[in-house]
Amino acid sequence: MEEDAKREWRDIRLSTIGSQDYEDIYSGRRRTALENLAHRYKRFAIIGLLFVIWAPLTFYNPEIQIDNRLTIIIFSSIYFLTCGLMDLWLYRGIRSIDCASMTIKEVATRALFYRKRHLQFIAILLPFAFIWIGILCYNLCDNTAFLWGVGLGALAGFAIGIRQLMKFLNDYRSITED
């Protein structure tokens, strides 16, 4: 009788889960919101740090004057290094949240702390991104194709950034709600 009750309870619980969710849960591919945040921060940190290597390689452009080229390389390297290190710090902070040993209040408090830092980092880095784009456009204002590329790249980056920010905020919301 007890086994029948357990089986019926499990069937009721699983009937509310979609088939894809059911497969994800039992295959181990399903991640928590904390794991999603950590994974996303790690990916952004790696991308930011890779762009530090990319910056000097791609700005070897003969159209830019030598002294301006060095300024662009230094500014972009510092910018991407800062982005990567900030994301790495957020990644390590999110990974340090342990739901098994912390109370719900501690988990929520730390998640809100890192959410606040994330938004502060955006507020710091966004003006520098606009300055970086402005420096590039100023130095290559004669090259129409480059200006179109910068404009379209900025629009695409803005759209992707907003989408990723919404994913970050949704994960933070799912951690701190209730």
Set out the residue ranges of the language-model regions:
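Alpha-helical transmembrane segments and their membrane-interface junctions
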Residues: 123-149
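Short membrane-interface loop/juxtamembrane segments of multi-pass integral membrane proteins
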Residues: 27, 100-118
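Membrane-water interface of transmembrane alpha-helices
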Residues: 84-101, 168-169
